[in-house]
Amino acid sequence: MELEVADFDLPSAIDNALILVRERASRRGITLGHSVDERLGPIRGDERKVKQVLLNLLSNALKFTPEGGRIDVSARVHDEVAEVSVTDTGVGIAPEDQEAVFEEFRQVGTADKKVEGTGLGLALSRKFVELHGGRIWVKSELGTGSTFIFTLPVRREE
């Protein structure tokens, strides 16, 4: 799997991903919020793959956030690294399952809460982020929601 690398505007990619999920969120009464550091601008990477990571994280947040919940996307830059997080007020993930969610074909949680999906979204997201030289992880607590965070090096064409 290769990256198609070019400079692209990360804040615009975040805005575009939010636009794509806004209607689904609205239908379920889920509030979408976002906060982007104004110092964050163009980065060098594969825009399509980064957008796919954002959409995977937002789609998962929508699946697991109850009606009336909230999803926030934030992005900041520090030490030449862009850090993007997607936080939801969903069901949360048990500590023992937090690494397993990134495995292929793996879905965690209770069997009575069957959710559509292949179990590939987070595995692909990890692959795409790591191809960029970044990291992805989750912080979560059962019953209070999850925050998925990924980092990307801020490299710009010289």
Description of each model-found segment:
Residues 4-9, 26, 31-41:
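Conserved catalytic submotifs in the C-terminal HATPase_c
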Residues 10, 92-100:
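Short helix N-cap motif at coil->helix boundaries in the Bergerat
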Residues 61-62:
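Short helix-loop "hinge" at the ATP-lid/N-box region of the Bergerat-fold HATPase_c
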Residues 68-80:
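Short beta-strand/loop element within the Bergerat-fold HATPase_c
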Residues 106-116:
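Glycine-rich ATP-lid/hinge loop adjacent to the conserved G-boxes
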Residues 121, 125:
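Short alpha-helical Gxxx[C/S/T] motif in the catalytic ATP-binding
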